[in-house]
Every structure is written in C-alpha cells, then in structure tokens.
C-alpha cells in the first residue's frame, strides 16, 4: 500500500529497494539544489506531473543555484555526500551523477551544476522528439 505521507511512490524506484527517502538528502542541501534534486528524483513519477515539467522545474532551480554557487563549491557533510551518491548511482540517475562526481564526493561544483543542466536539456529535447 502506498503511504502518500511518509513514503510517496513517486520518489521510489521499483528496481531498487530504497532505504533512504529523498528528504534525508534534501534537508542537508542548500535550498535551490535541494529543490532541483527533488524534481529530478521524482521526474515523471508523480501523478499529474510529466517528466518534462519536473525536469523543467529542476533546471530552473539549478540555474538559480548556479547564480549563487558558480564560483564556490557547495560543501557536503559526509551523510549528504553518501546519499547523493546513492540516488545518483544506485538508482541509475544519470542526470544527478554530475552533482556527485568529485572523487571524494564532498562538494558540488559549479561545473557539476552546469553539466547537470545540460543533461536535463538533453533529456527534455528527447522528450519533445517523442
């Protein structure tokens, strides 16, 4: 049974058993990045919201984050770094991967944000072509 309050299905991945909720990660991130991550994780999974709309919102939030963090790294605490890596790798979310790509995964860089925006735009182009 879907628990829409504590564990909404649009944040779940049927192929992988989730032991973490997105909120475990997003409450540890700066607001614009947290909002973008939420939209990326749920893209196309929430009833009434298309993948394109969710990714468009994620792109909007990442552009806001880029204005704020383009010239400085966003430092992550160890748990946030592990959770970001978990959602990017174990859930095969290639859009999230650039945010977690530093070797020690302890920072989000401006370049990582730019690459993530580019991956969102590529996915949006594919969705438009379908």
Q: Language-model features: where?
A:
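Intrinsically disordered, low-complexity regulatory regions
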Residues: 1-130
């Amino acid at each position: 049974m879907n628990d829409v309050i504590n564990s909404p299905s649009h944040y779940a991945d049927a192929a992988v058993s989730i032991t973490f909720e997105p909120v475990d990660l997003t409450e540890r991130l700066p607001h614009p990045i947290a909002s973008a991550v939420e939209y990326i994780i749920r893209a196309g999974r929430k009833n009434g919201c298309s993948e394109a709309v969710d990714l468009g919102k994620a792109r909007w939030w990442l552009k806001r984050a880029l204005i704020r963090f383009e010239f400085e790294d966003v430092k992550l605490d160890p748990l946030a770094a592990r959770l970001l890596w978990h959602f990017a790798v174990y859930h095969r979310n290639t859009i999230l991967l650039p945010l977690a790509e530093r070797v020690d995964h302890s920072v989000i860089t401006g370049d990582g944000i730019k690459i993530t925006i580019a991956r969102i735009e590529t996915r949006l182009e594919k969705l438009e072509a379908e």
